[in-house]
A protein has these predicted regions:
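Long, charge-patterned amphipathic interaction tracts in eukaryotic proteins
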Residues: 37-253
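Long alpha-helical, hydrophobic tracts
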Residues: 1-67
Length: 253
């Protein structure tokens, strides 16, 4: 991925984190995802044009990268993993999860992996900050559940809303891309489908995963509907202008 793209995405996320206006924050995050999708489309079209001269996939190889999401045994890890899979899904990255949910393995083009990590790290901070703000107001006590149960339920709702928002941003970017006038050039849908198939093929070859991830609900016995709704509300607003958002990588258990 070009440093310019990563810098543009990073600047948009920094703007989101630096504003107290929830609508501006949401717009910055959605624009970051749109830029990532537009870049992916343009890159795939360039690869398609060169298919008679180069191996499919162009000069950017498919890679596998490891990303630590938290210390072993930290309860919030499963939601950090779930958030990563949500961001990865809209950026053509496949994911394996460690048995203890302390790290993930991303499979895809390096450009996509870089964008996924940028978006994930920003949204993880957003999620933790938004939950803490509400807990500071006593919402977990009003719901009649423990702080941990409330927080994890909040994360459920938050991630659900973020997933919807990022998918919408991807769809908007694809719809807004003007069709090329070059005769014989493949459609956006076609190149993205071929890219997805290429990543899947690489994953099938490179992955040595066994079994399946148990998900964010593993080991939980209680949840809070009001907390989930609060999470959906904050996830839809993407309110990144809260205290503590600069502490990247911090997600309370």
């Amino acid at each position: 991925v070009s440093d310019r793209l990563v810098d543009r995405v990073g600047k948009l996320l920094a703007q989101a984190e630096g504003t107290d206006n929830e609508h501006e924050a949401a717009a910055f995050v959605e624009r970051a995802q749109q830029l990532a999708t537009e870049h992916a489309v343009d890159l795939e079209l360039a690869r398609a044009r060169q298919r008679d001269r180069q191996h499919r996939g162009g000069g950017e190889p498919l890679v596998q990268e490891r990303l630590a999401v938290g210390q072993r045994g930290q309860r919030g890890n499963r939601h950090r993993v779930l958030l990563y899979t949500v961001v990865a899904a809209v950026n053509d990255v496949m994911v394996n999860v460690s048995h203890d949910s302390s790290y993930v393995l991303g499979f895809g083009h390096r450009s996509d992996l870089e964008v996924v990590e940028r978006l994930w790290s920003s949204l993880a901070v957003q999620m933790a900050a938004a939950a803490q703000r509400r807990m500071d107001k006593g919402e977990h006590r009003a719901a009649g559940v423990t702080g941990l149960s409330w927080r994890l339920s909040f994360y459920d709702g938050f991630i659900d809303a973020v997933s919807t928002r990022l998918q919408r941003a991807r769809e908007v970017a694809i719809e807004q891309r003007q069709p090329s006038e070059v005769a014989g050039e493949p459609s956006t849908a076609l190149v993205l489908r071929e890219k997805s198939e290429r990543v899947q093929s690489f994953y099938d070859t490179a992955s040595d995963a066994r079994g399946s991830w148990r998900g964010a609900w593993s080991g939980r016995t209680r949840s809070s509907r009001t907390a989930r709704e609060s999470g959906r509300t904050d996830g839809a607003r993407a309110d990144l202008g809260q205290p503590g958002v600069r502490r990247r990588g911090q997600l309370p258990a």
